[in-house]
Amino acid sequence: RSSDLWPDYLVFLIDNAPDLGTFTLYGHQYCEGEILPKSLYAKDPIFPPKESYIPDILSHGTKLHIGLVDIDTVKGGDLAGAVQQQISRGCRILVFDAITKRDTLHIIRTLQPLYPKVFWTGSLGLADGLAEYLYGPEQPLPPAAVRQVRCLGFCASAYEIAKKQLAY
C-alpha cells in the first residue's frame, strides 16, 4: 500500500478542466456541464460511471480517510484552516471543488508552501495550474504555418469520443 510507503504524504485531488467544461462542485464531478453519470462518459462501453461523488468513488479503492474542501471554502473561506481541520480529523486524501483556473491556482498557491509533501493528482486543470505556479503564465506561441498535410490514423478503441476524434 502506498500509504505504508509514504506515511507522511497527503493526496490533494483537483479534478477540473475549465476549458472543457469539466469541474467538481460539492464533491460531484461534472463533464461538459453534465453530472458524470449523465455525461458523455455514460456511454463508455467498458466502465460507464454510476456515481458522481468523488469521495465515494475513491473510497472503493482505499481505506484511507477522504475529505472534501467545498467550493465555498475554495472561493472565500479559510482554505488553509479547512485543510488543517480535515487533516486533524485523519483525512489523508482531500478532494477540492474547483470550477475555474483561478480556483485551481488559489488552491495550489495557498497550500503548496504549507504542505510540501503532497501527491497532487487530478486532470488537465491541475496540470495547467501546476505549470503556471511553477513556471509562470502561459506564453503565446507564434502562429503555425498552414500546411497541406494528409494523415492516416488507426484506433482500436470502442469509445465514442475516439470515433469522434478520428472523424474530425
Can you name each region flagged by the protein language model?
Residues 27-29, 74, 110-112, 134-136:
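Generic preference for flexible, low-structure residues
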Residues 49-53, 78, 99-106, 121, ...:
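Conserved active-site and cofactor/substrate-binding residues in soluble primary-metabolism enzymes
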Residues 1:
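Extracellular interaction modules
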Residues 4-6, 110-113:
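Short, surface-exposed basic-aromatic patches at helix termini and helix-loop junctions that form
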Residues 4-104:
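Cap/lid and interdomain-hinge subdomains that line or gate substrate/regulatory clefts
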Residues 60, 109, 132:
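Short, well-ordered alpha-helices that flank and scaffold nucleotide-derived cofactor binding pockets
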Residues 25, 45-46, 82-86, 107-111, ...:
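A generic local secondary-structure boundary/capping motif
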Residues 112-168:
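Acidic, glycine-rich loop-and-beta core segments that form the ion-binding/anion-interacting portion
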